[in-house]
């Protein structure tokens, strides 16, 4: 049976930590229209979520290096290019194959002033050996050279190739990741080619894109991190539960996160479109995956559409997705992973 997160426990823990040890949270940037939640009463449910302690640099923990930006011209989407950054942990050893994690909407996952701050989380979890040593790639949606780079305030829904790449249920974005990005990474870094050691994740449209990559290419990616996934009828994403039920099971592990105050497709006139209800469709995804015997976990909270809830549960998502990585039982092997002490925080 998959282990389900206790949202109540997470909220209480996050609240207590925020009052005792965690620095005040960085105010979030305003989302674009596609990410802006509908009003849901006087109380903002996102206020109950705080950055996890592991989203902060910790004393004594060596920091990884985030390299880039780099530009990746696309053959799958001619005339466009993808900007990406590569996170290399302090513990990376070129002689030992590392695991791999890809983050769609990379700027939103790596921004130091953002909600997730994935590079700090990975610094801390790798140091404590709660996840394997892994290279991470923060990749933005494709755009033409004359279009602006996505930012925390503008994820690119109106002025990049994001809607076509992320929401369409075909294999073209998987080709960007597998056929265009991976060969570049393999040339530069010693990354394991075992698909069990490859993960991909994202938020909103970036989450359904992550699932599509693993669905199309389970020979390359078998771990999916999905936050407020757009499994809705933007471009047919609400069909996935039925597709899952009708298809042979694939060796994919999935962690889904969403909140009851996500976009619920309620119009001012009282009409309701179930196919565009984010929370409902995420629950449908979990049910379909469970019925087919997938390794699936989920956390249903009260958050809106965005990354506020994710900032609390993100470390646990990584731990769960990578829970079966190798563990040393040598009684003399008790020191945290600190290969490069020169990068320890000051």
Where in the sequence are the language-model features?
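Short coil/turn motifs at helix boundaries and re-entrant loops, enriched in small/polar
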Residues: 10
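N-terminal signal peptide c-region/cleavage motif recognized by signal peptidases
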Residues: 13-15
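Non-catalytic cap/lid and distal C-terminal segments of serine-dependent acyl enzymes
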Residues: 19-346
